[in-house]
Amino acid sequence: MVGTLDEFRSQLIGGGARANQFRVEINNPPAGAVGLDTRNAAFLCTAAQLPGMTIEEIAVPFRGRSIYIAGDRSFETWAVTFYNDTNFAIRNAMERWNNSLNHLVTGQGLTNHDDYTADLKVSQLDRDDRLLKTYTFVNAFPLSVSAIALTAGGSADIETFDVTFRYQHFVTDGVIADAPSGPF
């Protein structure tokens, strides 16, 4: 139980991690001629997530009751939101990557897993832009590139779109000495 405001404040190390202090690194896959400007993608990324993970449960029936044991691990997809600039640089690159998996017209695509996947990263930063923790998404590829909503309603908003990636697993690197790190 929290005693006083000062005790609470002393437990909130670094003033708390801030949701707007992050950096993403989207790398090009070896094949598919994606041509993504990775620096531009890092700047124009407006939203990302630190990943989630789940251990499935296995129900084992025994005399009218179930005992639950840990099952397989599963990982959620990873979604990133980008601002769309007027040359569509990031959008075009994501469409090329997605198209290299299954061509819009021919239905053909890259079949060698190592040719169409790349490692991607999201890092939590502190308020001085120092790394607190980095998640590396291993062997990622884009599952979907979202639609961009257009409207004649007079809004002056900059277009955004989401890219959802599937990956095999993630690895963490904690900069803080006490933080556990390693593959998950």
Per-segment meaning from a language model:
Residues 1-184:
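Glycine-rich, low-complexity intrinsically disordered segments
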